[in-house]
Each structure stands twice: as C-alpha cells, then as structure tokens.
Amino acid sequence: MRNCRVLLVLVLSLVIVLNVVRASDESKVHIVYLGEKQHDDPEFVSESHHQMLSSLLGSKVDAHESMVYSYRHGFSGFAAKLTESQAKKLADSPEVVHVMADSFYELATTRTWDYLGLSVANPNNLLNDTNMGDQVIIGFIDTGVWPESESFNDNGVGPIPSHWKGGCESGEKFISTNCNRKLIGAKYFINGFLAENEGFNTTESRDYISARDFIGHGTHTASIAGGSFVPNISYKGLAGGNLRGGAPRARIAIYKACWYVDQLGAVACSSSDILKAMDESMHDGVDVLSLSLGAQIPLYPETDLRDRIATGAFHAVAKGIIVVCAGGNSGPAAQTVLNTAPWIITVAATTLDRSFPTPITLGNRKVILGQALYTGQELGFTSLVYPENAGFTNETFSGVCERLNLNPNRTMAGKVVLCFTTNTLFTAVSRAASYVKAAGGLGVIIARNPGYNLTPCRDDFPCVAIDYELGTDVLLYIRSTRSPVVKIQPSRTLVGQPVGTKVATFSSRGPNSISPAILKPDIGAPGVSILAATSPDSNSSVGGFDILAGTSMAAPVVAGVVALLKALHPNWSPAAFRSAIVTTAWRTDPFGEQIFAEGSSRKVADPFDYGGGIVNPEKAADPGLIYDMGPRDYILYLCSAGYNDSSITQLVGNVTVCSTPKTSVLDVNLPSITIPDLKDEVTLTRTVTNVGTVDSVYKVVVEPPLGIQVVVAPETLVFNSKTKNVSFTVRVSTTHKINTGFYFGNLIWTDSMHNVTIPVSVRTQILQNYYDEN
C-alpha cells in the first residue's frame, strides 16, 4: 500500500493556476478550439485535426508526434505541442476560434440526506419515487476512484443503462473488472500533464497511472453524489450512521484528469486533460457532470475560451447534460465566486445541523464546549498554561498559535496550552498542535475567530477550537489562580437543535466579478464535515472513509439531487433543473430559523452567499413554474456580453447575428434578477413555463429590496392546456440618492400550493463605475 502525507488544503482549496516559465521558442501544449463539430463521425473530425496540424508542421509524422488530444465528441478541437509562432499561425486561421496555452490547476454522508429531507424511511419522497436515481449516470472529473470502496457496491443495482457508451480503461492497479453495475465507467487523461511535465517520473510517482484514486478526493465526491448503502459507518465513532449518496442507485462514471505531483505535495489538473475528459463524457452518455474544480480571481469572461470549464460545459449543456460545479473556497470575501457561466449550476457550501462539541472543564468547574474531532482518551485534570512573559525574565514567550515554537519547551511540556490566532488558514490549528507536541505538551486549546472553520486536528492529540470570547474566559481563569488546570473529554456528535445552519466561511461569495448581472452562486448545499468514502492511501482515511469540507463536497450533493430530479423529469432541460432548485430552495433552516453566513462578522445570509438558498429536493421535484432556457437564451447572453458574431457562430454551430442594439443582459431568463448599476428606471422581461397542474392561476407577491420600487405586470398569470408559457415584465426604480451597496428582496409567484421564488438583488449607482473604498 502506498503511503503519503497529503495536506488537507488540497480538498479545501479550489483551482490554483501553476505558473510555468518557459522559453518562448520552446514547444508547449496549446489547445486549438474550433467550436461546434461540423461532422457526426468522430473519426472524420479527428482526421481533419491531423490534416490541419500536418499542414502547419509539414508532415504527418510531425503532426502525430505533436498531437496530444483530438476533441471530437462534444465539440471540435485538439491539443498539440506547438511553439509560440506555430500557435500564432493557427490562431490566424479563419477555421480556428481560439488558441490558448495549456495551464495547470489544483483541486478546489451519514447525516446530509436526512437533513435535506431524503430519508429512506419515507416511502413517499423523491428518493423512493425515482427508485433512488436508477438509470441516471453521474460523471465526475476529479482525481479518480477507489473501486473497491464499499460505497461502490452494486447490491440491488439493476442492469447498466442502455444509453451508456463508455467503458472501463485498464491501467496501473486498475483493470476493467474493477467496474460493476454501480461504477460503470472509469477513464484517465494524463497526456496533457505529461506533455507539459516531461520530467515527471510515472514509475516513481506515488499516484497511480490509471483511474485509481491516490489522494481520495474523487472517491469522496463520487460517493457523496451516488454512493451505495453502507451500514454503520463513522469517523472514529463520530458522525455515525448508515452511509449513502444522494442517488444511491444512480450509476457513476469517473474521468481522472488530476494528478498528484510528489515534488509539489499537491494535485495538478491540465486544462487539455480536463477538456478531453469533458469531451469523452459527452460521448459516453452521462446525464449529470460534477466538477469540483475552478479557476482563480481574476476570471476570464464566460465568452473567453480560456475559461475551459465554461467552454466544455457549454457544449455539454447544449447536449442536455446538467453541469454542476463548486463555487470556490475563497470566502468570505465578496466577488470571489468561481464557475460563473450562466449554463453552469454553481454551488456554495453550508453547514449541517451537526457539530462535534468537545467538553473543556476548567479547575473552577466551568465547562466550555469547544469543537474538535478528538477521539482519544479523556485527559484528566492537567496543568494549563498561556505562554506570556510575567516580567521576571528576558526569555521570549508567545501565546500566538503560530509562534508557540518560540517558547521554551519547559513552558509547554506536560501541559495543555492555550493560544490565540487571527490566522484564517486551517494550518494555524495543525501547526499549533505540532509545536505543542514537539515540546512535550499534552494538548492545545485554540481561540480563533468564531466565523472561521479551521480544521480540527486529525489525530488523537487533544486539540480543541473555541472563539475569542470563550478563549478570554479561559485566559482570565489562568490568570486568577496559581495552579490552573483543565480536563478535556473526547468529542461527541450533536445533531439537530440547537445547532443552526450557516453558510461556511470558506465558501466563495458573490457578486459575480465577471458578469455582475448573473447571480452566482446559484444554490447552497451541505459541504462542511461531510463523511464519505476515500482512498485508503489518504493519511486521514479511517477504514476507507473520511470527513472533509469544501465546496468540493457541496457540488456533488447538488449533483446527487439533480440525478434524482433527472430520473423524475427525464425530458427537462438543464436550465429547468437549475430553476427548480433555485426557486424552491430553503431560506430558513429545518427549524424555521434564519440561515446565517459565517465571516467577520456573522450576518443573515443573502443571495450572494447561497443564491436561492439551500437545496430543497422534495420541493424541487414539483416547482410549479420554471424559468427555462435553451440555446437561444445562451446566445442572447453571449451577445449581451460582447462576443462577436463570428465567434458565437463557431461556438454554437449556427450562423448567429446579434441584434442591434444588443439585448440587455438583464433579460436573460434566469431564475433571479440582479441589477448591479441601477440609476434610471429599467424594465426587464421574464418567461415562466407551467410544469404543474394544467389549469393554474398564479398571483405575484413582491418583497422589494430596501429603497427599491418593483412593479410586475401582469400581476396574475393564467395557465391552461393551450397556454403553458407566459411572459411578464418587471419595472425597477430606486429612491436612493447616493451610491449604495446591494439590497435584497424576492419576487414570488404563488398558487397557494407553490411559492416560485426568485431572489432580487439591486445596487443603486448614481455615479457609475465608481469605487468607494470608505
């Protein structure tokens, strides 16, 4: 068995582009994008790519050696090793939409599904109405899969869906028989990575040159969305229960495009490999595609083909595949949300109604409940210290967690140490623990910002997090007595009241930095302390399972819900699923309490934190009305975003001429209204489609943002057998006389059974394009 210390940041942080400096005349991988494929025969498409490359390089042999991938299923293009001058020649060709250099990226349950209302015990819910997602195929582009995991058993799973065209690719320690009726596909894509890293030693690499997962990230995400039933699973006794995915009878297809790099201690995902994985998934017949990947701020426009995920997702959505992406882990800062294309479902991360309280008992018998994943033995009353200079020595003392190593070892040896940190990185916890352990200490209590989810220590060393208020209480106790002592008990699992739901601190926030009128994220889902399968090679694996956090975990939650909805509504468009999820979302927690957003300071959550709210699977199954979108709507968006006619034509495969004047981006038929620069009154249009009772009457309810006037016409929508689509206008004006921040409200259509709700976000900008740093 291979062993490696894999830093948890890899599963908590979304994509970071790795800059590679090369000489300008050296060949490197470029992606040549040709737009929509012009022929249905993939062999014909590939041959055209080789001919184009042969014409450029002068011979078929050189073309063959240069070619990395031919994209021939979902769209047309290829990846090849080219010099800068060769790439420029291709870019000047009228057949070529865009040429871009390859780049490298890193990566971005037992309680989750009951929390979301999908209990197996209820025979009349979405889970059972859809036979648990049977016949729906979910594809994952990630780090691979551990096929022997119990989460991928095929007990009770029927025949492989007839529309599946993929297969299982053999490789290092992976053979085709590792697949079954649950795990029906597994492929790997490494050519782009190898072409850019010729020094990479595939023999000595600790990763598997196959679809087998080394670090466990891909296994974790796949088991969250579509894992089978596994009884009596816990993490060292915590978070125990019966484990399953959201759609436990859905089928799983794995596309490994991310590789562990020993020298970096990190994972890299080549753009060319990701695009090839997306291309293959379109050919293979996946219904839902889940990507826990993304880019870094600043983003490329969705209309810029350097946004590879948006480009691949466009073609997937055009073929009816629902694409779900993680929104990023750069929160709580505003304008950090990733994967913002309007054809992608972008997911924020929230907490569950579950926590792991860890009792801390002071010598004065006061009990404080911290948070940890401590599963070791109870630490009886032990000396407690806060390292500080009492003025009797010239030695250096520090109670700052990151500087505990500056203290003399005798200060911490045999004691529990209290420290404070303002550091928002998870490593502040693990490093503090390592410093105390190295000095012979017995435990550490870390006081930190109450809005930050610093990952608790992962071993059996007592390491407990509390907030500044409680930390100050502990410090005052230490200073009040000559011999302060403390007792630390193992963590426990607390579910339900009084644990509230929050948007996670790390979850990236809106508004959309590249297209502010497009609300992102779309939806929130549990992504904190999620227990799921992992690779046994992962250093934090316990029996092949692990607790992880990130929007990487939240995205497959939504992918699992979408798989159930796809089984119930097989003919819906990808936009219909997004609309159903957004318009029916929870804006309060299961106990009717407001959902807060963690950060400095904690506040009531708004659409920039979690879009429409937290995904509500049962309500999404019967939304009443949907805000549907198709190719025409996406073309409208592309035109309004400034893309030129020829590029749009090659992208969509049809001759496209944008109207003059261009249509407003505010008229894109999204299940949201976002106006980032309101000065004068604006009127926008939306169209809703009835997917509920044929004869229905809906009345409007407006909850306007503060200081904003919203008038809807008509105020009543009537549907019958002949009228299934109805348009309405929304007139928006402001009473504010100064530039403001965003204010939030809602527009609701109700027929007494359904409340079809879209968020309304408006910012008044009397002085346009003005940055106010005050």
From Swiss-Prot:
Domain PA: 383-478
Positions of glycan attachment: 128, 201, 232, 394, 409, 539, 644, 654, 725, 755
Transmembrane segments: none
GO biological process: proteolysis
Keywords: Cell wall, Glycoprotein, Growth regulation, Hydrolase, Protease, Secreted, Serine protease, Signal, Zymogen
Keyword RNA-binding: no
Propeptide feature ranges: 24-108
Keyword Methyltransferase: no
Positions annotated as active site in the UniProt record: 142, 217, 552
Cross-referenced PANTHER family: PROPROTEIN CONVERTASE SUBTILISIN/KEXIN
Official protein name in the record: Subtilisin-like protease SBT3.5
Organism: Arabidopsis thaliana (Mouse-ear cress)
Gene symbol of the encoding locus: SBT3.5
